[in-house]
Swiss-Prot record:
Catalytic activity line of the entry: L-glutamyl-tRNA(Gln) + L-glutamine + ATP + H2O = L-glutaminyl-tRNA(Gln) + L-glutamate + ADP + phosphate + H(+); L-aspartyl-tRNA(Asn) + L-glutamine + ATP + H2O = L-asparaginyl-tRNA(Asn) + L-glutamate + ADP + phosphate + 2 H(+)
Signal peptide range: none
Lineage summary: Bacteria, Pseudomonadati, Pseudomonadota, Betaproteobacteria, Neisseriales
EC identifiers of the protein: 6.3.5.-
Entry's Gene Ontology BP terms: glutaminyl-tRNAGln biosynthesis via transamidation; regulation of translational fidelity; translation
Name of this protein: Aspartyl/glutamyl-tRNA(Asn/Gln) amidotransferase subunit C
InterPro entries assigned: Asp/Glu-ADT_sf_sub_c, GatC
Pfam families hit by this protein: GatC
Keyword Protein biosynthesis part of the UniProt annotation: yes
Record keywords: ATP-binding, Ligase, Nucleotide-binding, Protein biosynthesis
Organism: Laribacter hongkongensis (strain HLHK9)
PANTHER family: GLUTAMYL-TRNA(GLN) AMIDOTRANSFERASE SUBUNIT C, MITOCHONDRIAL (PTHR15004:SF0)
Subunit structure: Heterotrimer of A, B and C subunits.
Length: 95
């Protein structure tokens, strides 16, 4: 599946990205490369391959559930721009 220049413009608009005329060819090549990789992965015969959650079948070492660090809240909040009642105050980003 090869994308056309018009497809790149449509994808950029849907993703709310500004792609200039000069960048369009490079973006088209990169997207076509991604789709080629996906097609190559789809072509691999995986019949009989057992799904796995992790490539190494090893159990992770667990440490004891014990406190290993001291309380540094006051030191961290001393350098914070704004703190109130032990909480960090941050600017509102969503109206």
């Amino acid at each position: 599946m090869a994308l056309s220049s018009d497809d790149v413009v449509k994808i950029a608009r849907l993703a709310r990205l500004r792609v200039s005329e000069a960048e369009r060819g490079a973006v088209q090549g990169q997207l076509n490369g991604i789709f080629d990789l996906i097609e190559a992965m789809r072509a691999v015969d995986t019949a009989g391959v057992e799904p796995m959650a992790h490539p190494q079948d090893a159990a992770l070492r667990l440490r004891a559930d014990a406190v290993t660090e001291t309380d540094r809240r006051s030191a961290y909040q001393a350098v914070a721009p704004q703190v109130e009642n032990g909480l960090y105050l941050v600017p509102k980003v969503i109206e």
